[in-house]
Amino acid sequence: MIEFDNLTYLHGKPQGTGLLKANPEDFVVVEDLGFEPDGEGEHILVRILKNGCNTRFVADALAKFLKIHAHEVSFAGQKDKHAVTEQWLCARVPGKEMPDLSAFQLEGCQVLEYARHKRKLRLGALKGNAFTLVLREVSNRDDVEQRLIDICVKGVPNYFGAQRFGIGGSNLQGALRWAQTNTPVRDRNKRSFWLSAARSALFNQIVAERLKKADVNQVVDGDALQLAGRGSWFVATTEELAELQHRVNDKELMITAALPGSGEWGTQREALAFEQAAVAAETELQALLVREKVEAARRAMLLYPQQLSWNWWDDVTVEIRFWLPAGSFATSVVRELINTTGDYAHIAE
């Protein structure tokens, strides 16, 4: 298995170094649900600003304040503890009376707004996230500047970030032990983390191998292509390659890579043979995913940060702003810019 730090770069290994997250204010995340609260219903959507506390901790504190069980407070995604983050929590509070959430107090946390909503906010139910990152102590401004320009055109690999695999790769190591011993894992969180790490590592490996090709975005026979921003895909045939290539070049279509698991992977012929060869050595992880009935899926191979802009405060400090769809990792963008001295594994998704 390829270590995360050794995965293939789209723009070549960065020439310079830099510091990511010198302080929490250097990593700002604003959650974008993609919808507004209904204004009625048995749930309350609460938009919070937090610094120095993780999402679960705030959710538990909110439940205690509202005198409801912790499982009655949900969220669309975990946000980093060591960052300034803005996100929505959802509390189930039936009844006509609206609690006064302006009285909710928690160090490092502020309620920005709240309103009634008809449906529970479920994990993953967000459109994306807007990021404002500050890279400090940048050693090669010209290289970073050129990379930012190139990323606007060519994007970055849509790798799962190192944080998906746990500190020191602990989640992936857990998956490997589980695969090798076949010992039942009762802890639901561990099961989820380990299976996710296994599938993500296989995806990363497939993408890393594809990026070694001379023309990364060249459609081949049997590729599974996805309409940009959509989840479904279709298979490319030899007769359509020229037309499909044009649509990929226009970013209307995205080439996808496998999230291996049980069932068909989605590619056929040449593309399927390539993907299978890329992870052929990882038989134990593949067998684990099949055994645990994790369904195979697809994910775009490349990621195009939207609304990408940047501002150099001085020759060694740059502020970068961009928006990413749900499930994508800001650290996969930073990885193409600098050899960072920050710790990826401590950054929540």
Swiss-Prot record:
It comes from the Bacteria. Substrate binds at F27, N129, F329. Residues 155-303 form the TRUD domain. The keyword Isomerase applies. The keyword tRNA processing applies. One of its GO terms (biological process) is tRNA pseudouridine synthesis. One of its GO terms (molecular function) is tRNA pseudouridine(13) synthase activity. The active site is at D80 (nucleophile). It catalyses: uridine(13) in tRNA = pseudouridine(13) in tRNA. Its EC number is 5.4.99.27. Keywords: Isomerase, tRNA processing. GO terms for cellular component: cytosol. Responsible for synthesis of pseudouridine from uracil-13 in transfer RNAs. Belongs to the pseudouridine synthase TruD family. This is tRNA pseudouridine synthase D. It comes from Shigella boydii serotype 18 (strain CDC 3083-94 / BS512). The gene is truD.
